[in-house]
């Protein structure tokens, strides 16, 4: 049973998690575990914080500990399954999810993740390399000619469309001040990875001798602060942290011209001339030219519908004082995005309850 100190730390950790401060949440859960090391709930919740931070190996370890302490805790299996999927351990993930589902039948989260596992496993099984016949290879059998002939008779003359998949899968999530991008590249030496940051551009190059090079150069959803952005090459992934220029939620990683185009302030020539350069082992890119093209596109775009509404809310936030900004962030987070208030006196001392639109149902977040 958790002690009073552990319960207090657990409450603070959950509050930090809701505020998207996942690092603080993980730290508080660690302190709670030190005070009450036999509480399975704490390990399962810290696993969720680790998943948000991209620490998937640590998340699996915490989920396993929670399962050891309480073999019937369904959410511990859910955490393990989610983390194993991110680590591309789909068979392990599926086994954990199937066992957890036996304790929580009807929970759609399990069925959704199990379906994803099945799809990923099928993809891996279908990726069989096709090699050209070499000199001295055995001749095809008569049966193979018959099968090919029958297959050809049933095929349309139109050649099939083949989707070219990127070499490495990537994913991202938001925190209050950063967007964390993860590229799942296993065992890549740090010296073969080059990452360049621009104001609204990102360039990632992974070139391992003897392998096909990987290049990822998106125009980003919103502007970043290059000098505060950073990356780290780990054993199973490349983790890139993009420092947000504006504290807004990125709904995608790539720039979306129609719904999210927002005109930016023009930088004076004197300020532009003093733009710092960012070191890179790659050949120098003309970021000034790229950003000038971005600004030209944004200036020529006309806002309407959701884009105009989005600009309206950004303008309110940028012109607001500290109390108004705190009120906006607190009301938006606590109401699950259904309430936006600028009155700190009204929302500062109480929890903002969700108010879903007519015809919709508000569902609470389970930790």
From Swiss-Prot:
Region Disordered, residue ranges: 261-289, 347-367
Pfam families in UniProt: CS (PF04969), SGS (PF05002), TPR_16 (PF13432)
Induction or repression: By hydrogen peroxide.
Nucleus listed as a keyword: yes
Keywords: Cytoplasm, Nucleus, Plant defense, Repeat, TPR repeat, Ubl conjugation pathway
Summary of subunit composition and partner proteins: Interacts (via CS domain) with RAR1 (via CHORD 2 domain). Interacts with RAD6.
Protein name: Protein SGT1 homolog
Organism: Oryza sativa subsp. japonica (Rice)
Lineage: Eukaryota, Viridiplantae, Streptophyta, Embryophyta, Tracheophyta
């Amino acid at each position: 049973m958790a002690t009073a100190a552990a319960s207090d730390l657990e409450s603070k950790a959950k509050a930090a998690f809701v505020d998207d401060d996942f690092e603080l949440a993980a730290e508080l859960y660690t302190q709670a575990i030190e005070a009450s090391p036999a509480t399975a709930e704490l390990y399962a919740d810290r696993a969720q914080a680790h998943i948000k931070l991209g620490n998937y190996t640590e998340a699996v370890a915490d989920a396993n500990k929670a399962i050891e302490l309480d073999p019937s805790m369904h959410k511990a299996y859910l955490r393990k399954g989610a983390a194993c999927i991110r680590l591309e351990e789909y068979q392990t993930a599926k086994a954990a999810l199937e066992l957890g589902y036996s304790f929580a039948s009807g929970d759609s989260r399990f069925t959704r993740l199990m379906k994803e596992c099945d799809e990923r496993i099928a993809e891996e099984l279908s990726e069989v390399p096709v090699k050209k016949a070499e000199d001295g290879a055995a001749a095809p059998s008569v049966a193979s000619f018959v099968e090919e002939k029958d297959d050809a008779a049933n095929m349309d003359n139109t050649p099939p469309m083949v989707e070219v998949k990127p070499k490495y899968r990537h994913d991202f999530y938001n925190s209050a001040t950063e967007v964390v991008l993860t590229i799942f590249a296993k065992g890549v030496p740090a010296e073969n990875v080059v990452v360049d940051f621009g104001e609204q551009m990102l360039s990632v190059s992974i070139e391992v001798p003897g392998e096909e090079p990987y290049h990822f150069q998106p125009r980003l959803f919103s502007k970043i602060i290059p000098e505060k952005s950073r990356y780290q090459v780990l054993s199973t992934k490349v983790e890139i942290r993009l420092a947000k220029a504006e504290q807004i939620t990125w709904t995608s990683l790539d720039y979306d011209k129609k719904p999210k185009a927002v005109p930016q302030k023009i930088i004076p020539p004197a300020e532009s001339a003093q733009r710092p350069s960012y070191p890179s082992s790659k050949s120098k890119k003309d970021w000034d030219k790229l950003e000038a093209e971005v600004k030209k596109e944004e200036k020529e775009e006309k806002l309407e519908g959701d884009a105009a509404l989005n600009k309206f809310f950004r303008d309110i936030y940028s012109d607001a004082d500290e109390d108004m900004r705190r009120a906006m962030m607190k009301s938006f987070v606590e109401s699950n995005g259904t309430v936006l208030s600028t009155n700190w006196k009204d929302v500062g001392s109480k929890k903002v309850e969700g108010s879903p639109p007519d015809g919709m149902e508000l569902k609470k977040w389970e930790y």
